Amino acid sequence: MSSQVYPKDKEILPGLHLEKVDDRIMTLNVGPQHPGSGHMRIILKVDGDYIVHCDPDPGYVHRGEEKMAEYRNYITNIPHLERPVIHDSCNILYPYCLGVEELLGLEVPERAKYIRVIASELNRCVYTQYWLAIYGIFLGHSTMFMWPMGDRELMIDLLDKMTGARVTHAYFVPGGIRNDIPPNFEDVCLRQVNYFEKRLKEYADVFYDNPILISRTKDTGILSREDAIKLGTTGSVLRASGVDFDIRKKEPYDVYEEMDFQTNVLKEGDSYARSKIPWLDMFESCRIIRDALKKMPKSGSVRVKLKPKPKGGDTEVYRRVESGRGSLGMYIVSRGLPQPYRLKISVPSFRNLIAMPHLLTGEKLGNMPAVYWSLNYWPVEADR
């Protein structure tokens, strides 16, 4: 090892300076490590085994989604807008379609509203199972990776039957959905959802009562109710800290007001509670899907016919939905053109990322993965 000591302001590379710190403090770069382009970096300062400072460094997968939307019309924006969260594509398109429908004064057919809700909840389960599987890797629990990755195929299969695509569906469009569901879909959907729910019940013994998960997540990264509200967290992170807030209940859209389900809330605020809320939410998704299948009109139109390149008025709208990670909103500014003048995407991942330094400071370094992924953070969505 070189014995050379650099002065505090010594420039090693353009824009890179070495900072003189206490001899006890070590700076660690966690990431970006990914077989693709790299997702995120977390800069940690540790004193022995304890984290004394955390500096998240997002932006490695920024693709300019908001700017891109200004150069495409309201319909051709759909395929690229779902890319930031490919495993929850229906829910990221949902607020966009609701906003454009408000701009254009469109009334969505009743049958399409129910099908949207079904697709949204199927996608929520697909995303949550993927998130849970990755959490298993973070915790060193291989079964927790394999089971969710296998069980999510039940929901992917249903979405494939509905939309013709396994992952990114481009299924929601302003004015309804792209196409109706196939014949006998209701029976297949009900059968697979019921089996999926039975599988979820087995997770309690194998995962949530498992000493591995409990020892890694209980009493780590505790976020109080007051701090959860103050930091602006959302979704499972907020509800794991005792705040009863779900947009499907508080600001219902389409036919969620008619659905029979409850909001899951826990008070512990630790990583264990944050890992459990999404699992409990999947049971409610199954309830919603069954209820929507029962109440859905058996026939009717599923899409409003639009003129090519429809134009909005000189106005602006904001619509938000409850995605698999929390509140996801779209702010659309229209100036009477076929494309948005401005599109701003408010994503839950970035809001929950704000809590990371608060939770990791003072924690042991070994607890970092468990706390980080419990925040339901999706790097690609945060960067947009």
Give, region by region, the residue ranges found by the protein language model.
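Active-site bordering "gate/hinge" segments
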Residues: 1-342, 346-384
